[in-house]
Amino acid sequence: MTSQKFYLLGESPSLAEEIDVPPHIDEESLRHLVASYFAIVDPKGIGFVVQDVCLTTVSDIMSSDDAVGITIDGKAVRGVPGPQGLPYIGNYFEVYPDHLGNHQRLFEKYGPLFKTTNMGSVVYHTNDPTLSNIVFGESDFFTKKLIEGHPLYPIKNKEAGVFLGDTDTEEWKTAHKFLPPAFGPKAVRHYAPTMQMTVEDSFKVFDELDERDEAWNVYPYMLKLGSQAVGKLVLGMDFKHFTSVDAPPHEMVMRIAESLSLNKKVTSMGSWYAMLPFGDPKRLRDARWRIADMVNESIERASKGVVNLDLQEAALTAENMVDYCIRATDNKGNKLPRDRIMEPLVVATGAGFTTTSSLLSWLIYGLVVYPGMQERLLQELVDNGFDEGTKIDADLINKLTFLDKYVKETQRKHNPSYQPARTSKVDMILPGGYKLPKDSVVIPAIHHIHNNTELWDNPARFDPDRWDSEKVKTRPNGSYIPFATGPRMCIGFNFALMEVKTFLPKLVYRYRFTLAKDGPIEYDPMFQLIRPNNLYVRAERRVKWPPKTE
């Protein structure tokens, strides 16, 4: 066995590592061998250089008298770039309040990976699908681990398992075994009647607003609508959100929404701020305790069966998630421990309605801002025999192809999710030659991936028909990730899509939506998700519908 010295181009040759190389090794195997020594994530990008000359054969590499430089995708290794920032404050005032616009500016300046520092916390951002796929993969390089600096660190909840817990825990393994069946495609189908009853129950409120000739702010009503369904299906609770026009959101809904806003404020100020015994950090802790108390109370009150059921059968028959969690049994007779039921349900409740209410708001935004969308959606409903009494199910939804494209395009251009971060497990070299230290928090920036001009033709244009194009059908893996991707992607995506694809047809068929207030639509930079703050619309009862397309 012979040996050769290798070093990372961009570093001193004096740091070269001597590596034993087996005889008769081919170039691909040599790349993998070198990658293992230097923690290079993707061996395919490795090249070899001596004195500015690229070496393309193993014999040339092994016969070199000089140490061999390693390039990554033709580049020398380098640190991740980013703005320098101010002492202590870092880049806070370069990022906030318009973090979407400012991050786009930084991507344009620094490229597909950059870092920012806010009040001592360093965070990395990428709009590159290749890097995002690596980051989202639970691997030797990355995992979901909520350390200081992670956007969810102040509300980390080990007992929850999903969303707010680390992957490398028994709690996550247990929750990930029991919860996904309740959110699978078959399980979600049997939630459809409750979802439909929820939106139909809201009609009396929207009808009254129409009779008053009154405009309304979309997000607060979509928050009430989304959470009304989640309250019934997860906790077995009726939040009574549509008993009147001015019915207030249930305390649990307000507390969860408050906690997401407070968490964003706390994380933007750095990890030290989260430890303060007063102010927003204390309010955040108090909100979490109150939410836990209310969920425990709802668990005791929720309608529950008495017979244990197999996971899949329980998912298809349980009245609500409380019922499911108590009765579901795996093939070894194990159940979700009673003391681990409350925390996952808190997460399922909060994540369930905050995401769908934001998405519903953007879907209505599209109806009143982008010409022709509302008319095409309505025509598709009419062409499929839709009327006031139509029962929406998965079979009907599958026929509504324009609805599917409209939802996809809304999730591309106006995706509510913002910070699905992961943490590096080791020092590594990423594609592009970026050196990333261990315990780095990396955020695949979904909004900026979905609006990346290198991935999408004219991404600023809202165009549902792009989803019929060959380019979009053959788009790079990782270029459309509305619910993230990988083992820790959102487990509730089937639920969310079923909900919005049930609510929106019912609303569009009954009402004609128009924009009631001119001016730019603003988002709340201090909320965990991207939602429109000042979208006011009128919803007028339809009195006529178009004829079926001949």
Annotated model-derived regions:
Residues 160-161, 177, 181, 346, ...:
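Cytochrome P450 heme-thiolate "Cys pocket" and heme-binding signature region
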Residues 371-374, 442, 493-530:
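Cytochrome P450 heme-binding "Cys pocket" and the immediately downstream C-terminal segment
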Residues 146-152, 156, 190-360, 376:
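Cytochrome P450 heme-thiolate monooxygenase catalytic core
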Residues 1-123, 130, 134, 147-156, ...:
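N-terminal targeting/anchor module and adjacent flexible "hinge" preceding the catalytic domain
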Residues 530-550:
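C-terminal helix/juxtamembrane-tail motif
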Residues 90-111, 293, 390-432:
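Conserved cytochrome P450 K-helix E-x-x-R motif and the immediately C-terminal K′/meander segment
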Residues 74-94, 99-194, 198, 218, ...:
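Cytochrome P450 substrate-recognition site 1
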Residues 444-471:
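Conserved cytochrome P450 K-helix/beta-meander segment immediately N-terminal to the heme-binding cysteine loop
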